[in-house]
């Protein structure tokens, strides 16, 4: 950010908010993607491997993630992120305070789109710098391939997510659970866990067998990670999640949790979900009604079982993976961290 600030502000001091707001979005978060990238690298690297390539790759993932969150909040009309105003709200607040012409909201959304685009570019520049420092040229090429695939898949997954919020009415009920699971795989599981692991390992020159083990470990763990996030999106404490409780209900997320509630709940539960889910003006009492109906359907217990099954599969793969023992231990600890986050 320090190196890019001089480029941006040399164009005009009016661009200072782009840097300030970028810093704000990069200063928080749990750094899960960076951690998985680092431990993927550590799981296969030689003891004397230079650290700078993986630091650059992990940082590129964090900046990419920040950009994705900026765009995601625009898509979902989310007012907050990590307990603070989302990027488009920061910009529309700037517009309002400055007394400029036009609509605050329109300015905020347009500016945040550009901020996200800017950070996407910075992420790619940072990855390029990291790959140039890698000692294994073939591994660097593989890391770039994995990063490119991740960008395509997560964008596709994001489209599938917004599609499901609208297209579910035309789909057979029997297909909704599978469609919700597909969103999990591409919007989150591969992007949040599998890809960072493989990018880090590829950078260190991992063998095909090692990359295969990390994929087999990362996919079920990523699914469990997102299933936990879906539960938090409905029942989570705002102080823990940084988002208002029930935010996914207002946004109309057609998650595995919701699909299971519709499949196993009463007719009244299904009607309640279909009538209220996706209403941005849900009252607190309506959110409580939805939460109670979802809980009564048994969907939460079923999701908890899915989380446990996926974690068990990830641990099974990790136990016999051809990876360094210290990294295996840390990846095991991370497995607990990303799937046992509290309400």
Predicted regions, residues:
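Short alpha-helical scaffolding segments that buttress acidic/His motifs in well-ordered protein cores
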Residues: 22, 40, 58-64, 147-154, ...
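C-terminal helix-coil-helix/basic helical segment that borders enzyme active sites and/or dimer interfaces
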Residues: 43-45, 51, 200-209, 232-240, ...
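Divalent-cation-assisted or electrostatically stabilized phosphate/pyrophosphate-binding catalytic cores
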Residues: 82-116, 169-189, 212-216, 238-264, ...
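Short hairpin/turn module used for nucleic-acid contact or packing/dimerization
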Residues: 288-343
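Conserved N-terminal diphosphate/IPP-binding helix and adjacent helical/loop segment
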Residues: 1-61, 66, 70-71, 75-106, ...
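All-alpha helical catalytic cores of prenyl diphosphate-utilizing isoprenoid enzymes
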Residues: 5-12, 26-34, 113-122, 129-235
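Residue-level signal for inorganic ion chemistry
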Residues: 36, 123, 157, 258, ...
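Hydrophobic packing residues in well-ordered alpha-helices of helical domains and bundles
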Residues: 54-60, 116, 140-147, 214-217, ...
């Amino acid at each position: 950010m320090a190196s890019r600030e001089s480029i941006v502000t040399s164009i005009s001091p009016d661009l200072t908010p782009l840097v300030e707001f970028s810093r704000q979005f990069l200063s928080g978060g749990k750094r899960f993607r960076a951690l998985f990238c680092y431990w993927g690298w550590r799981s296969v690297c030689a003891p004397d491997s230079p650290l700078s390539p993986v630091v650059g790759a992990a940082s590129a993932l964090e900046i990419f993630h920040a950009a994705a969150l900026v765009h995601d909040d625009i898509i979902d009309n989310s007012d907050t992120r990590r307990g603070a105003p989302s990027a488009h709200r920061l910009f529309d607040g700037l517009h309002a305070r400055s007394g400029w012409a036009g609509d605050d909201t329109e300015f905020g959304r347009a500016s945040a789109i550009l901020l996200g685009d800017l950070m996407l570019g910075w992420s790619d520049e940072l990855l390029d710098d990291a790959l140039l420092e890698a000692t294994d040229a073939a591994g660097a090429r593989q890391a770039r391939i994995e990063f490119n695939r991740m960008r395509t898949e997560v964008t596709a997954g994001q489209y599938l997510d917004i599609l499901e919020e609208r297209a579910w009415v035309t789909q057979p009920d029997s297909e909704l659970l599978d469609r919700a699971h597909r969103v999990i795989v591409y919007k989150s599981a591969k992007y949040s866990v599998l890809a960072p692991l493989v990018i880090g390992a590829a950078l260190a020159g991992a063998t095909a067998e090692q990359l295969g083990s990390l994929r087999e470990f990362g996919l079920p763990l990523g699914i469990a990670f997102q299933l936990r996030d879906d539960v938090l999106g409905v029942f989570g404490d705002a102080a823990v999640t940084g988002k208002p409780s029930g935010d996914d209900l207002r946004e109309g997320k057609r998650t595995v949790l919701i699909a299971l509630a519709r499949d196993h709940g009463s007719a009244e539960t299904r009607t309640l979900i279909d009538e209220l889910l996706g209403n941005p003006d849900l009252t607190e009492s309506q959110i409580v009604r939805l939460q109670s109906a979802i809980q009564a359907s048994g969907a939460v217990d079923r999701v908890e079982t899915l989380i446990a099954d996926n974690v068990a599969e990830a641990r099974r793969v990790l136990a016999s993976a051809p990876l360094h023992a210290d990294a295996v231990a840390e990846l095991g600890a991370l497995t607990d961290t990303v799937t046992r986050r509290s309400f």
